[in-house]
């Protein structure tokens, strides 16, 4: 891959820590003491953004009341603006749904654990339609070891840089403390329908002091979710003929996951803390027959119920925190390594994303991420009370994928400047960033937060991300909040890599029926989005009501090309001289909607909480097609009753609005038949409760999908040879499921 290199030394990003030490030492070197008069300290910009209309917090108590069966995405999806979708509107890998914030897609959702990026899903091959065979990155931390989850949407998320154009999910774990505490939790669920996979998990956590200045935290987890039966969707599949007669779209695959993580916190001085952390996780699937095009072969059938992909994630980090006379500082260095081991798949046409019987066995793709981050927060009085944040960041991502760059050019013809075989399996990218934010108190109740972030990508080049957020108290009870920011996402390593090649004999070629290639493009621009929101909130005596309008003007979204850039030379028969497409930037797209919240205290201990997301539009402005298949509206409602000091009861319901499929097929023609099918509105209700048996023991029980509303996957959104499209019916919604949980703590 070509690159515009930027020399960078990651340890320079720890300069904030070194600067803080230097300033502190200068003030203490002669024994002098810096005395500060009484002053108001304004919150940092990061703290202030958590009060923005596009920010929601999920607490440990919330998780205990609505325990996920295995993956945290199950509770994150209940926040305003959040749904579970695929990366595109194709419906491929339809049951591998991930967090989608404000309709921008999972690839534009940045996942963090304790403020540090999680990138394991980027080790999974990126398909022609923009999908990955991935469960996402929200299942690396056991639910019972989470302190809180911050869900940050819109302009407030732009400060986090690459990949946060839709939003950020920051999973905060329970930390080391001054007293010894521990917990052991078990959870099991029991689907009413035996064809649906059950879940069970067990986790432990232990934290406390080792010495006066040394403390620790360790947690572990083992969990299993069984796969659905391979034929769960029989009788619901789209029409299939010829070689595809009798094939079925798969249900939800299962997963076995194990996690262990340890943290050591050393209080160097009263002002400084140094943390060392290491973690290891393993996730392995339980295969139920899913392929990219919902087709099948004997190899697929042989592997039913077996493990066909394994993800091994290792993380190592060191973090320094300082509280100084002049402000505070944070610096960390994190190394993340993901080994993605899976069965070899085809890369051409209908065989893309299906096990390759001619190349049986596993391969391993390895992704290495290095992140260095440093920032200082400086309280100032320059006309107004304010806190200035200055920081820098350096990231490097290296991918070695020996399977995904193996498509040859014998049939379609040779491509100028590309080796027909034995291409490099390696790709990499580096980003250097500087950022500044200033949280200014213009008057009591009025906060203005301007910000600017500069990112230099060694292949894509420079990106500037300005932002401006405002919070103004109209009255003691009513607050107006507004924000605008330019967010961005760099192309991923597959899109940028000219050695990454896919092939089709014509079925997947836009605008024509002859053969074609899709090639990586190192001339891509970064995706950008100007995110705007305007919200108003009323709050008084537990009553909270808010309404927020948001609009994202999306530019340079990266999709597979719509026009050939060249033609191959030579080849075989009717497939010779294949058209050459490449990943390209779509000029303009738009996402627009409303978010509402309403919390009503009905009586002592009884509260009714609601949030609504209503999508006004989500479309590619060039084609008019949808960006992703999301419900027209989503309403989450919960009645929460603290019946006694020991007993808590909840009733929940989520209504999903109509879901419309994409309008155009792979050739650019209007879809017909079952590919037009929409999903009608539906609701999922639940009941749950927790009871504290003693000071150290609590019991939970409940039922999900109380009224047994089930959905079945019919196929992908649009068809291929022998398989009709399924429209929006691309995923399974499991039926009534009972669960129990037990937690012991001290």
UniProtKB/Swiss-Prot annotation:
A motif (TonB box) lies at residues 39-44. Residues 84-98, 402-411 have a biased composition (Polar residues). Disruption phenotype: In a pvdD and pchEF double mutant background, when grown in iron restricted culture, able to grow in the presence of enterobactin or various synthetic catecholates, but fails to grow when enterobactin receptor pirA is also deleted. PROSITE patterns: TONB_DEPENDENT_REC_2 (PS01156), TONB_DEPENDENT_REC_3 (PS52016). It is a multi-pass membrane protein. It is found in: Cell outer membrane. GO terms for biological process: enterobactin transport; siderophore transmembrane transport; siderophore transport. A motif (TonB C-terminal box) lies at residues 729-746. GO terms for molecular function: colicin transmembrane transporter activity; enterobactin binding; enterobactin transmembrane transporter activity; siderophore uptake transmembrane transporter activity; signaling receptor activity. Specific receptor for the siderophore ferric enterobactin. NCBIfam families: PRK13524.1, PRK13528.1, TonB-siderophor. This is Ferric enterobactin receptor. The gene is pfeA.
